[in-house]
Amino acid sequence: MRIVNLIILLFLFFQTSYGKSVENSPAYGYHLKVGVPEARRILLKESWRSARIVGGSQVSAANVIPYQVGIIATLTGGASSICGGSLISRTRVLTAAHCWFDGQTRATQFTIVLGSLTIFTGGTRLTTSDVTMHPSWNYLLNDIAFVRISAVTLSTTIQLIALPTTAETSQKFEGVNALISGFGKTSDAQMTFPTSTALHQATVPVISNAVCQNSFKITIDSSHICTAGTGGRGTCDGDSGGPLTVVHNNRRILIGVVSFGPGEGCQASAPSVFTRVTSFLPWINSNL
């Protein structure tokens, strides 16, 4: 409770200091602006097939991205919102802090979905309210959180994603092709058109923070990592908290957590921004 109160006090400090910039930030009010409408849209159209990640393709089987986690957030008041996550141990999921509290709306429970290509049906489902946001989270920085779950049984469709090693913390991964995945939208136009909850993926190149900064008015910090939006590929509404992974030293590792995208829209060919996992390894390892 003390940590939650501290986070709220820190948020109020930033809100007072930066005024309207807080309300205009990508994470502020995520659930009411993005998560709740997206959850309703998915529930209404779940039987249809369409793309999710912008510019991507549908994942063919649950064992293709077995570390992918779907998160259904139950909010104060009872509405549902959606996010993504990554399974990093049998009892831990890594996601974005704003999936639990976005500065405006707080979740009261997560339904964790594992081993499924759809978020509202299928797979292994666990409920939990045991979530730890980074203690220094604010509307722009440290957008990362731990979700504690009952120990899951690993299988061909439920697997862990490896974390970078200490020796890999200096790696920036610039120019490397990375994999993004999620249950979110694939276009800015997707509102009530036929769609589905099918998991989708796309390959995108990691770019330097300097190049990324050119597309944003807010500061891109060293604790962020960005991917190019060339060809309209990138993350979209509902993908928050999901994984950014690369193959490095012959193993796939988690290097980013979906945080925010361009204000111009998902198809603006602008970069997607992630929380850089290597910047938080000490905190992550202390919570495993």
Show which residues each predicted segment covers.
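Catalytic nucleophile loop of clan PA
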Residues: 80, 86-87, 171-173, 233-258
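Extracellular/periplasmic catalytic domains that process cell-envelope and extracellular macromolecules
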Residues: 59-64, 87, 104-106, 120, ...
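Active-site-proximal beta-strands of protease catalytic cores
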Residues: 90-97, 175-186, 245-264
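Conserved H-D interstitial segment of serine endopeptidase catalytic domains
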Residues: 71-74, 93-96, 100-139, 146, ...
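Chymotrypsin/trypsin-fold serine protease catalytic domain
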Residues: 126, 144-151, 156-231, 277-278
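Protease-domain processing segments flanking chymotrypsin-fold serine proteases, especially trypsin-like
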Residues: 2-94, 110-114, 197
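Extracellular collagen-like Gly-X-Y triple-helix signature, i.e., selective recognition
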Residues: 197, 208, 247-288
